């Protein structure tokens, strides 16, 4: 016989919202964004060996790709000042290149200034806008909305939409090592890596996280989802930071990875879809993308090197 599913009520691990890492991070958003920009800039300078010629090449490559993206693949969610910003970057680079009397040190300084403007913009674009009041509202809407839809599917007739015969947890059964997951959340930072099935995954997994009494997770959501206003609201409310998969330049990718790494080090539980895109077959991915996932390893290594001893020191990938 099939074992009967028992609905559990889980007490919140952190009862006060003020204890949630995502709330603490949201309060320090301005300072955190600046930190991400500065660390990304330093990382890029290290990768280019502080060589002004290599840095110039990366800046020009970024400019070219961004101008091409704006022309060939614009999205509604893109900032209104995109053309203006990249036009200013182009003007600055032309100005530096035209000044033949500059020393190598001064030329590098000028390029660093342009780099700083780019990483600052990227960091601000990527950063989440978590608000606790919006999170509570979104949780209620998800629970109410999906419950009504599931009742309509299981109970015949139009009036079934308003039925409360079945709750969301009646249909979506939360099974597995739930107690172990809750225990890990009290001992360190969790990085969750589920298989991606649909655009509703983030919302439904967010609801499951809430039901299990875990504090909200942050996660990278494709910027294309923010083209739809209602999705944008829910994504922001659930702690999503933005991932623009059109941008493949070094400066954007390093800023994105730095944001993920520093968020995990801050103690924010995180969620990645390791396949990078939806699994049409429903099978667990045999090949995973290691870009953002590698930031969990980087964060753990950094914690070890700095001797961090608090709860954020240990990172668990589940």
Predicted features and spans:
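Membrane-interfacial terminal anchoring regions of lipid-handling membrane enzymes
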Residues: 1-318
């Amino acid at each position: 016989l099939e074992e009967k599913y028992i609905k559990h009520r889980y007490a919140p691990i952190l009862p006060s919202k003020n204890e949630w890492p995502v709330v603490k991070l949201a309060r320090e958003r301005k300072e955190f964004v600046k930190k991400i920009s500065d660390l990304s800039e330093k990382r890029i300078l290290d990768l280019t060996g502080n060589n002004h010629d290599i840095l110039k090449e990366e800046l020009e490559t970024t400019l070219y790709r961004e101008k091409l993206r704006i022309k060939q693949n614009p999205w509604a969610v893109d900032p209104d000042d995109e053309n203006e910003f990249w036009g200013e970057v182009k003007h600055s680079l032309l100005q530096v290149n035209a000044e033949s009397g500059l020393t190598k040190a001064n030329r590098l300084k000028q390029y660093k200034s342009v780099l700083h403007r780019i990483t600052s913009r990227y960091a601000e674009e990527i950063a989440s806008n978590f608000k606790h009041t919006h999170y509570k509202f979104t949780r209620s809407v998800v629970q109410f909305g999906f419950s009504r839809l599931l009742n309509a599917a299981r109970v015949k007739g139009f009036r079934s939409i308003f039925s409360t015969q079945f709750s969301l947890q009646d249909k979506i059964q939360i099974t597995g090592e739930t107690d172990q997951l809750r225990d890990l959340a009290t001992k360190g930072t969790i990085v969750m890596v589920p298989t991606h099935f649909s655009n509703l995954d983030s919302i439904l997994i967010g609801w499951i996280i809430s039901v299990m009494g875990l504090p909200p997770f942050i996660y990278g959501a494709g910027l294309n989802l923010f083209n739809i206003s209602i999705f944008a609201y829910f994504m922001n409310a659930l702690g999503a930071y933005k991932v623009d998969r059109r941008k493949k330049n070094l400066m954007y990718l390093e800023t994105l990875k730095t944001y993920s790494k520093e968020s995990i080090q801050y103690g924010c539980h995180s969620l990645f879809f390791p396949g990078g895109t939806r699994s049409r077959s429903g099978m667990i991915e045999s090949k995973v993308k290691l870009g953002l996932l590698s930031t969990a390893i980087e964060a753990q290594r950094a914690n070890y090197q700095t001797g961090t001893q608090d709860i954020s020191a240990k990172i668990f990938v589940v």
